Amino acid sequence: GYTDFDGYLEEAIPIHGVMGDSHGALYGQGCVNPGMIKATYGTGSSIMMNVGEKPIFSDKGVVTSLAWSLSGKVNYVLEGNINYTGAVITWLQKDLGLIASAKETEELAKSANPGDTTYLVPAFTGLGAPYWDSKAKAVVSGITRTTGKAELVRAALDCIVYQISDVVN
């Protein structure tokens, strides 16, 4: 097909390919060989691994999809999508007012009591991969009298790592 982007271009140009954002990121980050993996962070996250020309089906909560088709060769991926990663930082800033900007999180987390056991499950809109539980609710646990802003921020950063680890493992 062709497009002129609804009149933006003087002439229509040919469409040579269409690709979703996560799949485009996989290709753009050079993950073109089986076993190569990428993580894309945004409001949520997409963890994707190139599995090559034959689909692999997992029973671990990740999905199989088509990566791309080039020159008659099809590549497949295993993918896990996480609902809340970057949005956790937005929650700290805009909803809780604990930080003025995302830049503050690293220093705050470093200053947290290393023995604090505060843990966040950011299921504000359910849980994505690998659990796929749309009814799950967010939980903050392990709070003690000494838990403060730094510990809550560290728990928020940790929950991003835990979710990525859950998908990869």
Where are the predicted features?
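Active-site core segments that coordinate phosphate-bearing ligands/cofactors
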Residues: D4-N169
